Amino acid sequence: NLAEFVTEYETFDFVGFKDTVKKAVVALNEVLDEGLPLHPLIEQRESVKNWRQIGLGVMGLADMFIKLGIKYGSEESIKWINMIGTEMIFSALESSNELTISKGAYPMFNTKVVDTPFFQALNTKENNLRYQELRSNVLLRGLCNSQLLTCAPTGSIATMLGISTGCEPIFATSYTRKTESLVDKEKLYKVYTPIIQNNFISKGVPENQLPEYVVTSENIPYTERIQVQAALQRYIAVSYTHLRAHETLRH
């Protein structure tokens, strides 16, 4: 949950984020090992063993932007996505590399991975030293996993936790929920999206006076949605639920 790393001073805790990503990679590898013998088909077990694919993802991106006072889809939000994405992929790769000390590299590992456009794109002026160290360690020990990061829609999980789903914007600031009883009685009641309820409504800010940086899928231009996804998928595989305004043209 990216929103959890926003501090009370409206900054992002990159140190805590890095530590969490590394621990999550370790945890997912433990889950993979625990579940490996439970696959019913030998082909499945061999695939898991040979490729060791995990999928650490994110949710709460929209909530994070609201906490930071940044408009989803703005140029500033793209800069933040690049900073967070860079830290996430570096930390995940470093953790997977460190795991090879105890678990070894995944059997299908090939050193040519460091020559791929994806890996080489990490070599920027700001991250050159970190990149060179990572590259050397990968050539020396390999990686424990062939795949590391995957951003799922997280619809059910995020709703259960009361946070924004995956990397999507919030779909509305409020909505109407209906319940039905066994005697066919309906009850309609208004529900505020948790981030709106907690950060504004509960503090006396009316829904019609929310800050301009609070946007929903109904009022974000589809081009900005695409820019957000394009920025994020430089670092992580994305499964994206593209909620759009009703009047958006099919093209």
Residue ranges with predicted function:
Residues 3-6, 42, 55-57, 65, ...:
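Generic, ordered loop/turn and secondary-structure boundary motif
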Residues 28-37, 128, 137-144, 149-244:
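Catalytic alpha/beta core of large soluble enzyme barrels
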Residues 1-48, 58-64, 68, 163, ...:
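Function-dense linear segments that define catalytic or interfacial modules
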Residues 20-45, 49, 53, 71-154, ...:
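Internal maturation/activation junctions in enzymes
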Residues 11, 15-18, 79, 83, ...:
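Charge-dense, low-complexity intrinsically disordered segments
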Residues 245-251:
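A short, hydrophobic C-terminal helix/tail in secreted or cell-surface proteins
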Residues 74, 193, 248:
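Residue-level signal for threonine
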